[in-house]
Design a protein with these regions (language model features):
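Nucleotide and nucleotide-moiety/phosphate-recognizing core
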Residues: 1-106, 112-126, 134-147, 151-155, ...
Length: 168
């Protein structure tokens, strides 16, 4: 599923790629770098979505990037159009989040300069992304229910893809 996400990010015109957490994948596209959660340097060893966001922001900050697009590994159906709209929304906000029957915080883009804010929220005990980012300028980007579909394995991804192709 990471391969599909990589292809969608690349097709959206992005040119720096990383996946956060877990173990490094062998034989994976070398342009898609593994970033360990530990890069966040919070020292607690706890795993959380917010720590993953903090790790992504820290990696982007250390590599001189201005913004990040963060997609959970279980949302591989996000379109290039939505990715581009998330990035464009950063012209007027600190964070842009996918919206489909509510905010979908595993699909977002953020300016790297929010890193210190996210770190402070994490150190204050917050772990929910939406609570940590609530006092920032947030844009909501409408997307389809398909894009927000939680896909937990390759077989499900293939089935959804086949069904989408048969509907065309």
């Amino acid at each position: 599923m990471l391969q599909v996400i990589h292809e969608n990010l690349s097709a959206a015109g992005l040119d720096s790629f990383a996946y956060v957490g877990g173990r490094a994948r062998e034989g994976f596209n070398p342009t898609f770098r593994h970033v360990p959660d530990e890069i966040a340097d919070v020292g607690d060893g706890e795993q959380s979505s917010l720590r993953g966001v903090l790790a992504a922001l820290t990696h982007a900050w250390t590599t001189g990037l201005e913004a990040v697009v963060i997609l959970g590994c279980d949302v591989p159906l996000v379109t290039t159009n939505t990715i581009q709209r998330l990035v464009s929304a950063l012209d007027v906000s600190d964070v842009s989040v996918a919206e489909c029957d509510g905010d979908h915080w595993s699909i977002l883009a953020a300016r790297v300069d929010i890193r210190e804010h996210v770190l402070a929220q994490y150190l204050a005990g917050r772990r929910a992304i939406h609570r940590a980012l609530t006092d920032l300028r947030i844009s909501r980007v409408v997307c389809s229910t398909t894009e927000c579909t939680n896909v937990n394995d390759v077989a499900t991804l293939q089935l959804i893809t086949e069904n989408r192709l048969s509907d065309v």
